[in-house]
């Protein structure tokens, strides 16, 4: 399940489609935005159904009842919403909906531990922040600009200390 709508969410959704992921659930507070992205991606999910009657590509509103059902059916949640940029933000997913079987990736890289990642740990689930994504985006940009391998270890250290 992907909380998508902005640039990072769209990029992650497109990569999921290009990699032919088995199932993608797009969740957004503005359902029309998610539906538009669903239409763009639909051709990548038009093949045979591997999961029986379960939709391979689905759009849901970012509402507790819709999230509750989906979270019981999936393994990976990607938060690409801005919720969590500030430490005072609430978790975009209520802790009562999180379960140990979930892996949560919070694309936010502003802080090591976001409200969602704290809730994830409290629920006994696994989580990761967006620092690795930021690191490898920066490394790729470095290699394009300077035409040499990026100093990944030094870049990682700067991010962690930074």
Model-assigned labels for residue ranges:
Residues 30, 58-90, 105:
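Rossmann-like NAD(P)-binding element
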Residues 19-50:
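NAD(P)-binding Rossmann-fold cofactor-contacting core
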Residues 45-64:
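Rossmann-fold cofactor-recognition segment
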Residues 1-17:
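Glycine-rich adenosine-cofactor-binding loop
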Residues 85-89, 94, 100-152, 156-158:
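Rossmann-fold NAD(P)-binding glycine/threonine-rich loop
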Residues 1-2, 26, 106:
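Hydrophobic Val/Ile/Leu positions in short beta-strands of Rossmann-like dinucleotide-binding domains
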Residues 17-23, 122-126:
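Conserved S-adenosyl-L-methionine
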């Amino acid at each position: 399940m992907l909380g998508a709508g902005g640039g990072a969410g769209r990029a992650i959704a497109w990569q999921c489609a290009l990699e032919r992921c088995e199932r993608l659930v797009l969740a957004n507070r503005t359902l029309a935005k998610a539906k538009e992205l669903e239409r763009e991606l639909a051709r990548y999910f038009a093949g045979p159904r591997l999961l029986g009657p379960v939709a391979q590509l689905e759009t849901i509103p970012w509402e507790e009842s819709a999230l509750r059902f989906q979270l019981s059916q999936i393994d990976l949640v990607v938060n690409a919403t801005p919720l969590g940029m500030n430490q005072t933000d609430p978790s975009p997913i209520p802790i009562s909906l999180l379960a140990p079987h979930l892996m949560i990736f919070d694309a936010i890289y502003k802080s090591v531990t976001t409200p969602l990642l704290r809730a994830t740990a409290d629920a006994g689930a696994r989580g990761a922040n967006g620092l690795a994504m930021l690191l490898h985006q920066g490394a790729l940009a470095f290699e394009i600009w300077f035409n040499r391998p990026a100093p990944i270890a030094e870049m990682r250290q700067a991010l962690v200390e930074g």
